[in-house]
Regions:
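Sec-dependent N-terminal signal peptides
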Residues: 4-12
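Buried hydrophobic residues that stabilize the cores of well-folded domains
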Residues: 19-310
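C-terminal motif of bacterial Sec signal peptides marking the signal peptidase cleavage site
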Residues: 14-16
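Positively charged n-region of N-terminal signal peptides that target proteins for export
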Residues: 1-4, 18-19
């Protein structure tokens, strides 16, 4: 899990090389990419910092450092990026700290033109490979299938099976229905641990404005989002290539998130909560800082902040 969190944060910054949608150009325009990103917790203490090296319009490397409550580094992650043309071919990650086994891995990417069709993550210190295959209908992502090894039992013995995560996308105007099915296949081919979930996203103007999740007939959740009209450094042509399902992520909309209203219904009871985001912008309409608040007892309580240096 720690590797996943680190990996998501690093690749989120990695692909935030903003350039206006101009064909399939995925190089970086000077002044629009945050070369240094600092994350602070609700108490204003630095939780992590990410610094990237950029040359020739490309990110060549990045380094993330994670800190404890006392400000001491507890974990680092260093990335070396290689390209094929303007597309990322490989990301080699070396991690140190409390969980180096899952912080050290290599990701390789395969394309059909500029469409990502396969990504493979190989861990360096544990024997584990995760593969994701992507399918499209024209320019629309229709299916993702992720496979990874998992320990299971068969005939009373511990054996290695394969966990599948199949994600299907169905489009109907502004609404996108995402069906996710997970299951484990044992060496004999027997399938177990099946689970299916549905989420509906409403996307308007390049932003997710609503997310609807049904957990059971008596448990549902709806999240409604609002945005500013400024530039979001986390969305660009490279984002759309390297993260094909970017369009269902609230943080990867065309603009920056302002509010999130979460309505949960459980056993005929309704619970509502809100989150807020405040920004300071530079003269190019990119955020230089983001403050995150949660509503508690009708008051806004700090929940963390981010600082961007371009």
């Amino acid at each position: 899990m720690k590797k996943v969190i680190l990996g998501l944060v690093a690749i989120a910054a990695l692909v935030s090389c903003k350039k206006e949608d101009n064909g399939n150009d995925s190089t970086i325009q000077e002044g629009t990419f945050p070369k240094e990103v600092t994350y602070k917790n609700e108490n204003g203490k630095v939780a992590s910092k990410l610094v990237s090296l950029i040359e020739g319009g490309k990110i060549l490397s990045s380094e993330m450092e994670i800190y404890n409550e006392n400000g001491s580094p507890i974990r680092t992650q260093k990335d070396i990026i290689t390209y094929e043309g303007n597309l990322i071919k490989k990301r080699e990650t070396t991690g140190t700290g409390d969980d180096p086994n899952y912080n050290s891995f290599t990701e390789t990417f395969s394309y059909d033109g500029t469409k990502l069709v396969k990504s493979v993550t190989d861990y360096k210190k544990v024997v584990k490979t995760i593969t994701t295959i992507y399918s499209y209908d024209g320019d629309k992502l229709t299916n993702m299938v992720k496979t990874e090894p998992i320990q299971t039992t068969e005939n009373g013995q511990r054996v290695e099976g394969t966990k599948y995560t199949e994600t299907n996308f169905t489009y109907n105007g502004d609404r996108i229905t995402v069906k996710e099915k997970t299951y484990t296949k044992k060496p004999s081919g027997f399938i177990t641990d099946e689970n299916t979930s549905f989420k509906i996203y409403t996307v308007v103007g390049g932003n997710v404005v609503k997310k609807e999740v049904t957990y059971s007939p008596s448990a549902k959740e709806t999240i409604e989002y609002t945005y500013d009209t400024k530039n979001n450094p986390m969305v660009n042509n490279l984002t759309k290539i390297i993260l094909p399902d970017y369009f269902i992520e609230k943080s990867r909309g065309r603009n920056n998130l302002l509010t999130a209203t979460i309505t949960q219904v459980r056993n005929n009871q309704t619970f509502v909560s809100k989150e807020y985001y405040e920004y300071v912008y530079n003269d190019k309409d990119y955020p230089t800082s983001q403050k995150h608040f949660i509503e508690e007892n009708a008051q806004k309580k700090p929940a963390g902040s981010i600082e961007f240096q371009y």
